């Protein structure tokens, strides 16, 4: 069995919308890598999605990936909602356009290239890796605020 790659992801936004950042702590066995970035004008949900996208984009080959996020929006979107959105032509059950569909489509493509499972962690609750991802996201946002 492949050693899984763990992606601990988080997004941050100073104002919503406003300056935002994303952060990823990657762990593969004893190896770690930190990624972060940001945008001048964005939302917290876009940064949560971007964190996962950037983590997956950094992988160099097909992997078993465990994504640990404190975002119910991202986890529920990928595990539950996306199937209906795709069936409905990227419309919600209320027939409204899916928000952030550009990022959802990119994430859907990237997830298809790996064996991915999703884990939700409570944010700001002392989970060491999530706190590190949060710090990285805030560093990303600080570049634009």
Swiss-Prot record:
Domain of life the protein comes from: Bacteria
GO cellular component: cytoplasm
Gene Ontology molecular-function annotations: magnesium ion binding; nucleic acid binding; RNA-DNA hybrid ribonuclease activity
Example of a GO biological process term: DNA replication, removal of RNA primer
Reaction(s) this enzyme catalyzes, per UniProt: Endonucleolytic cleavage to 5'-phosphomonoester
Protein name: Ribonuclease H
Cofactor note: Binds 1 Mg(2+) ion per subunit. May bind a second metal ion at a regulatory site, or after substrate binding.
Predominant localisation class: cytoplasm
SUPFAM superfamilies per record: Ribonuclease H-like
The protein's required cofactors: Mg(2+)
EC number: 3.1.26.4
NCBIfam families: PRK00203.1
Binding site for Mg(2+) 2: 10, 134
Ranges for domain RNase H type-1: 1-142
Known partners and oligomeric status: Monomer.
Source organism of this protein record: Neisseria meningitidis serogroup C / serotype 2a (strain ATCC 700532 / DSM 15464 / FAM18)
Family the UniProt entry places it in: Belongs to the RNase H family.
CDD domains per UniProt: RNase_HI_prokaryote_like
Acetylation among keywords: no
Residues that coordinate or bind Mg(2+) 1: 10, 48, 70
Keywords: Cytoplasm, Endonuclease, Hydrolase, Magnesium, Metal-binding, Nuclease
Function: Endonuclease that specifically degrades the RNA of RNA-DNA hybrids.
């Amino acid at each position: 069995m492949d050693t899984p790659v763990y992606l601990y992801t988080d997004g941050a936004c100073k104002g919503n919308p406003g300056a935002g950042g994303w952060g990823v702590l990657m762990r593969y066995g004893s190896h770690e890598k930190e990624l972060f970035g940001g945008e001048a004008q964005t939302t917290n949900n876009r940064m949560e999605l971007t964190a996962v996208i950037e983590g997956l984009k950094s992988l160099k080959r097909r992997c078993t990936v465990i994504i640990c996020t404190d975002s119910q929006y991202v986890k529920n979107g990928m595990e539950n909602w996306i199937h209906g959105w795709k069936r409905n032509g990227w419309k919600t059950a209320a027939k409204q356009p899916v928000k952030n569909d550009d990022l959802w489509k990119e994430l859907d493509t990237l997830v298809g290239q790996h064996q991915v499972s999703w884990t939700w962690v409570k944010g700001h609750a002392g989970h060491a890796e999530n706190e590190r991802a949060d710090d990285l996201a805030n560093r990303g946002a600080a570049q634009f605020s």
